[in-house]
Design a protein with these regions (language model features):
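Active-site-proximal, well-structured secondary-structure segments within enzyme catalytic domains
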Residues: 129-137, 144, 170-318, 388, ...
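C-terminal, non-catalytic "cap/extension" segments appended to globular domains
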Residues: 3-15, 46-47, 91-92, 187-190, ...
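Glycine- and acidic
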Residues: 154-161, 193, 200, 204, ...
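Post-HExxH zinc-binding segment in Zn-dependent metallohydrolases
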Residues: 207-217, 355-389
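Active-site recognition of the HExxH zinc-binding catalytic motif
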Residues: 323-342, 362-366
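N-terminal helix-rich structural modules
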Residues: 1-167, 189
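Extended, well-ordered alpha-helical scaffold/bundle regions in very large, multi-domain proteins
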Residues: 52-56, 64-69, 193, 197, ...
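Beta-rich nucleic-acid/ligand-interaction surfaces
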Residues: 293-302, 352-362
Length: 535
């Protein structure tokens, strides 16, 4: 980077000039990559998929420069960088440079394999009764259908994509592992955890602690749920199989309870409800919603997400909305991500203009997604009049939802680590069902030997990510407790807390430092357990 005036004899100022110049090169590349990701998801075109691979590779090539990596490392090793914001920017750059010290051909191949898998997920439609069907159509059958044979057919259809992507995904895992090993890591999974500033041993110790804390209450919950499902389908509890559940992966609880949450949203304007609510928080989302793509159509990606295009306010959400509790919660969740991105201070340095960590933005998103099972939100945002008994029922539905979803997250975290440790092992299909039976207590179909694990999009498009959902749920409960302790009044008080204690920090510190800043304590499962387990 020549031609940049550097203050002579001031190492901190010299470093800042270098960092700013690097950020200026990075910003347009990131913008192009995010636009390509958006175009690929909303159109499903092969041209957009090719553009996605090219733009992602361009970002990684910027970080493949060995001279830049050496410069950042030397600056961090010196004792002359005293400005904490500058040091944090250098730390983040170091993580990116570390992951990308790879040959251009390797970068290109990895980007192309990843984009091809995402393209398959965006465009694939399962076949049921000889016709292509959407994920939403399959979910409707699993949620409402009483014909067990048709439910089984719908569940099996939801797994069809696994056969199409399993081998390409294995190959991508092999290539990622080879790249990680060339950089000195045992495998890609361990590399990614280190680059996410997470310690693998401590992470899985926390996951094991969480499993032990929830084993007994979850077993009791499952016995109750199994009795209800067995009664609905006129069968014995031991005869229940995955297609008796309302979600293809069992990651959401079957609808139960006296309050039909789907009925509350039937015929409702989900977008208007969300817009009104975020205005009440003091975190308006109207411009985000105007830029977003919210409705189903052929060729469009079926997995919801939020993307920050440029760190300058161009934030968008992709959904495939239907008037259901699931999609209301999803829209609130994605707008939680968007609020974090939109309402960060614009004067932060570009490299710090992001959430502190994936788990911190997931925590905010989950805080919002939980609201469809919050009696106060249903009353004030929806105008729903709930009796005391109905409020208790909704609270129990939230507890059920949290236990079911977090036990599923354990499956994904343990399976993905095993996948990267041994992508060529012949028992991956069996391992998947062993984890499902252990963590979720869902019985495998007899004789089934299919790559059902590969049907989960995150393994292809968001590698080494799923543990952040569970950590995010723990942080959500911890944030909620801190908001209550703070005396924040009403929804606006909650919005102020998030903006001032979480969003305003950007990435100035790591996720652990942010959490202590926001709540006064390090991450603990205690708040989740007190909220959903101990009671």
């Amino acid at each position: 980077m020549t031609g940049v005036p550097v203050p002579f004899g001031n190492p901190g100022a010299e470093a800042q000039v270098w960092v700013d110049a690097h950020a200026a090169r990075l910003a347009p590349l990131l913008r192009e990559a995010h636009l390509a990701e958006w175009e690929s998801a909303v159109t499903g075109s092969e041209q957009a998929s090719a553009g996605l691979a090219q733009t992602r590779a361009a970002v990684k090539r910027l970080f493949s420069d060995p001279e830049g990596a050496r410069r950042v490392r030397d600056l961090l090793d010196s004792d002359e960088i005293e400005d904490p914001l500058l040091r944090r920017q250098l730390q983040l750059l170091h993580l990116e440079f570390t992951a990308n010290q790879l040959p251009p051909e390797t970068i290109r191949e990895l980007a192309e394999l990843s984009a091809a898998l995402e393209h398959t997920f965006h465009t694939f439609r399962a076949t049921l009764d000889g016709a292509a069907v959407t994920d939403n159509a399959l979910l409707e059958i699993l949620r409402d259908g009483d014909d067990v044979a048709r439910r089984r057919a719908a569940w099996e259809a939801s797994k069809q994509i696994g056969r199409h992507v399993a081998e390409p995904l294995r190959e991508l895992v092999r290539r990622r592992n080879a790249a990680a090993r060339s950089l000195g890591f045992a495998d890609f999974y361990r590399m990614e955890l280190e680059l996410q500033e997470l310690d693998e041993e401590r992470l899985f110790a926390l996951l094991d602690e969480f499993k032990r804390a929830t084993d007994t209450p979850f077993a009791a919950l499952r016995e109750r749920m199994d009795r209800a499902l067995a009664g609905r389908f006129d069968t014995a509890p031991e005869e229940l199989r995955p297609w008796h559940w309302s979600d293809p992966f069992g990651q959401e609880a079957p609808p139960e309870g006296a309050v039909d949450l789907d009925a509350l949203f039937a015929g409702g304007d989900l977008v208007q409800l969300a817009a009104d609510f975020f205005r009440a928080l003091g975190l308006p989302m109207d411009e985000v919603l105007a830029r977003s793509d919210l409705w189903e159509r052929p060729g469009k990606g079926q997995h919801a997400f939020c993307t920050d295009i440029d760190r300058e306010g161009d934030v968008r959400v992709l959904c495939n909305l239907r008037p259901t509790d699931r999609w209301m919660a999803t829209l609130l969740h994605e707008l939680g991500h968007a609020a974090y991105d939109v309402h960060r201070p614009g004067d932060l340095p570009f490299l710090l203009r992001t959430p502190a960590h994936t788990l911190s933005t997931e925590a905010v998103a989950m805080l919002m997604g939980r609201l469809t099972r919050d009696p106060r939100w249903l009353r004030e945002a929806m105008g729903a009049e709930l009796t005391r008994e109905a409020q208790a029922d909704v609270g129990e539905q939230l507890r059920t939802s949290m236990l079911v979803s977090t036990r599923w997250m354990l499956v994904m975290a343990h399976f993905e680590r095993a996948l990267y440790r041994g992508p060529d092992r012949e028992d991956l299909n069996q391992l998947w069902w062993e984890l499902v039976e252990e963590m979720q207590r869902i019985r495998r179909p007899e004789g089934r030997d299919e790559p059902d694990w590969a049907a989960k999009i995150h393994l292809s498009s968001a590698p080494v990510y799923y543990h952040n959902y569970l950590l995010g749920e723990l942080m959500t409960s911890q944030l909620g407790a801190a908001i209550r302790r703070s005396g924040a009044e009403g929804w606006e008080g909650m919005g102020h807390f998030l903006r001032d204690r979480v969003f305003a920090r950007g990435a100035q510190e790591d996720w652990a430092g942010l959490l202590v800043h926001a709540t006064g304590e390090p991450l603990s499962a205690r708040f989740f357990v007190e909220q959903f387990v101990a009671g």
